[in-house]
Amino acid sequence: MESFKFKFCLCGDNCPSEREFSKYCVYTDDQQYFYTQKRLIPVIITETKKRVRKYPVNVKYVEIDINDVVDFFEYNIKNYIFTIFRELPIIMSGDCYYESSTIEIIKYIAKNNITNLSIFFIKNSKYFYNNAIFNGICCFSNLDVVKSIIKYIPISLLQNCLNHGFIHSNNDVVEYLLKTYMKYVKCILSKKKIKGTMFHLDSPKTVFLKLRSSLKYLLKLKYQKAMVIYEYIIDQFSQLENDLIETDIENDMIEIRDKIISKIQYNNEIATHILKDSLSYKQDDNLSFTRQLILDGGNLNNICDYAIDLIIMYKNINLLDLMYDKKLICQNDLNHILMSSSKTDPEFIQELI
C-alpha cells in the first residue's frame, strides 16, 4: 500500500494557525512532534502551492502519517483541541486546504479498503464529516468493506450513498445497498422489527428512495458514461419496483407500499424533469442523451418556452435542430429567436438563415 500523509490545514481562518498548532508540539533532534499522553506523533509543517477549488494558491498544513491519524484524532476529540472533519463552513478563505484534505484522506481510505479507519470515523461521526465519509466509501470501497460497515450507515444517508455508488459505477456496492433496503422495506410492510444489522436507523420515519434524485446525479458525468449508467439505474429501480409488487402484504399496508413504489417508478413526469435539465447539459451535437429521455417519455412540448430561451441565450443551434425535428418550432418562434439574436450575434443569425 502506498504511503499517505493526512494534511491538517493551518490557514488560521476556519482552521488553527501554525502558532496555535505549535502550542501542542515539542521539538527533539530537529524533529517536530505533536504531543499526546500516549506518545509523540511526528509532524511536518509544510507551505506550498496547491490547487484549491480550481485555483492555485499558497497553503499551509501539517503532514501526519496515515498510521498516526487515529492517535492524533482521538487526542483532539478527548481534549477538545481542534475540530476535524466538521461540516463545511459557509465561507471558506481562499487559502483553506480543509475541504481538499478531507476529500484526499477519504478517497485514500476508501480506495485502499482500510476497514479499521473507516469504522473509526463512522463510529465517531459526531466529530467527523460523516456524509462525505459514507459517500466516499460507497464510491470507491469494495463490497467487503461496505458489508462490514452497513450497520453504521445512517438510513437517512442511503440515497446519497446510492447516488455516489451509481456515478462511480460501483455496481456491487449499489446492488448490495438496494438488496439491504429491500429487506428494510419488507420488515416495515410485514410489521416486523427491523434488524440493527441492516442500517443505522437514525430516522423513525420510513425512508423513501427517489429515482429522480439518482438520475439528476448523472448530469455530473460526461454524456457517454451518463447514458450507460442511466440504463443501469432504470434497471435497478425497476427490479426493486417488481420485487415490491410481488411482495405479499396485508391490506392496511398497501398504501405505504404504493407510496414507496411511486418514488422509485419511472414515469413521464420524472423523464420530463430530467429532460429539462439535460437541455443545458454538455453532450454530443446530436443531443443523444436528450433524445433518449424523449423516447422514454420526456415531454419537450411542456418545456418548449424554456428550450427557446436556452437557444437564444446560448446560441444553441443543435437544440434548435432538435426542436425542429420534433415539429415544436413554429414560424413565430423562429421570428422571436431571430429578433432576439439579431443585435448580439450576427454569426448565429447566418446559421439560422
Curated annotation (Swiss-Prot):
Belongs to the mimivirus L17x/L18x family. This is Uncharacterized protein L870. It comes from Acanthamoeba polyphaga mimivirus (APMV).
